[in-house]
A protein has these predicted regions:
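An extracytoplasmic/periplasmic, membrane-proximal ligand-sensing/linker region
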Residues: 28-32, 217-219, 223-224, 246-248, ...
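Ligand-binding pocket segment of bilobal, Venus flytrap-like solute-binding proteins
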Residues: 71, 153-245
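C-terminal segment of classical bacterial N-terminal signal peptides
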Residues: 10-21
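Early extracytoplasmic/lumenal segment of secretory-pathway proteins
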Residues: 62-80
């Protein structure tokens, strides 16, 4: 997997020293709209609300931070708004799925924005995504999914739940029947519990620990596979395999590696629209660097059972640029295997 090194190495991070934010006069008395490009209850919304609770203290002028959810098209609705309509003055920031950023690489007509032109502020977590089934399902291991049909629920086109289920279906020959149209993780959880679906792919491990701690404690979930370049320690201890042993074709392995590496490196990233003055971008990057190592935020994260792994905005910017420089044959194959 020769793509792994370049993208995985970018995922390594260091947090810059945090001077007091500048531009106090600009942010004093202002409101920063913090948009989460998902429904409430999902991992991106949970992280956005946690960070918003503490972020204002790290910006001179102590602006009010208001979180607004803007779901749709796997995050592309919110990204389009940020790119085309949001104020370009540093008062609007976005938390969005990596799929909304990678989407234009897979379909140049898909989005109305150029992901390489966004101004990336920080990252809060390296995501490890999972395929799982509920306790009553006959599909208890990934080997079961290779041998018999599993009904896998998903949200909208372009979402991790749909694209991850699709590439598993095509690259490993998992017998997944994908049912799209669920509103978000809460609806998927209800569908699993009711037996409408066997399970779901593309959910984030850190968010799952916050959303369904009792299910995990009571072992109500069968964790089939962890979509990770290197095995996540907690999941490895639970015996959850990575997907690489199940992918026979070399180009398929490279295509899946491109998506998984990008998703893990990008994680929970935060961005501003192109055109925001450099002074405001510096202020926001410094603020994120500070808040993501703040003891109060980290204590709240522990209560929520979510992980914080800070990255700088500059590192996220390089992650995006590296993905868009990937070999065309790998990109073309990825385009095919993320469609159900």
């Amino acid at each position: 997997m020769n793509l792994l090194a370049s993208l995985a190495m970018i995922a390594a991070f260091s947090v810059a020293p945090v001077p007091r934010a500048m531009a106090a006069d600009f942010y004093a008395g202002k409101t920063i709209n913090f948009i989460a490009g998902t429904d409430t209850g999902g991992g991106f919304s949970i992280y956005a609300r946690l960070i918003a609770k503490h972020l204002g203290r790290f910006i001179s002028g102590n602006p009010t931070i208001v979180v607004k959810n803007m779901p749709g098209a796997g995050g592309s609705t919110a990204a389009t708004y940020l790119y085309r309509a949001a104020p370009k003055d540093g008062t609007t920031i976005l938390s969005v799925s990596p799929n909304a950023i990678l989407g234009k690489l897979l379909d140049e007509t898909q989005s109305q924005y150029d992901p390489t032109r966004f101004l990336y502020l920080a990252g809060a977590e390296h995501g490890t995504r999972l395929c799982m089934t509920f306790q009553h399902s006959k599909i208890r291991t990934y080997e079961d999914a290779l041998a018999q049909k599993a009904i896998i629920g998903a949200t909208s086109a372009g979402s991790p739940t749909r694209e991850y289920a699709a590439w598993h279906k095509h690259a490993t020959a998992a017998k997944f029947e994908i049912v799209s149209g669920y509103k978000g993780p809460p609806d998927l959880f209800i569908a699993m519990e009711r037996g409408e679906i066997d399970g779901v792919c593309g959910l984030d491990w850190s968010a799952l620990k916050s959303q369904q701690p009792e299910w995990l404690r009571q072992r109500k979930l069968n964790l089939l596979v962890q979509d990770s370049i290197e095995s996540q320690p907690e999941l490895a201890a639970l015996g959850v395999p990575t997907p690489w042993r199940y992918i026979a074709d070399d180009i398929d392995r490279e295509a899946v590696a491109l998506m998984v590496s990008f998703q893990q490196a990008f994680g929970k990233a935060y961005l501003a629209p192109p055109g925001v003055p450099a002074e405001q971008i510096k202020t926001l990057r410094n603020a994120f660097a500070g808040v993501l190592r703040d003891p109060e935020l980290l204590a709240d994260a522990e209560k929520l059972r979510i992980e914080i792994a800070a990255q700088s905005g500059e590192e996220i910017q390089r992650v995006v640029e590296a993905a868009y420089a990937a070999p065309r044959n790998v990109v073309e194959r990825l385009k095919k295997i993320v469609e159900p």
